[in-house]
Amino acid sequence: MVFTYTDKQLNELNQGKNVYSSNPEYAKRKGYKIVTPSPKNKGETNTIISDGQEFRVIATKSHRGTGFDGLAVAPIVNGQPDYKSIAVIAAGTDPGSPTKIDISSALVERDTSLSPQYLVADRFVKEIMDDPRYEVSQLSGYSQKALIR
């Protein structure tokens, strides 16, 4: 049985302390814990609670060159991660990011009609989908989510 994500959970997973904090620079700038699949240091976590539901972070991607930030989570069901109900979350653009991609974004988009984050986002989703341990049941995010299939 596939876990059903609520709109509220997906909305909260798309917020700063969650998906954006997969980028260590953002998390430090905002005073949040760094969201990572393998926390090794103080100030790092692999658990997100949204609308009372616990989620385990299984993968993150923060690409400095394009500003893409994303994560993949599994809901905790009966005390265990449900790897057959993975949600992949893509962050929107962080206007406070030191990555300045305005000019390069415009050039790439003009020539390809694609966001420069598209290839990074697409590759991230494919990595999760190609892992036999996981089944992606939900994609969520802002502008990049519409491009990922």
Stretch-by-stretch model annotation:
Residues M1-Y32:
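N-terminal low-complexity, Ser/Thr- and acidic-residue-enriched intrinsically disordered segments
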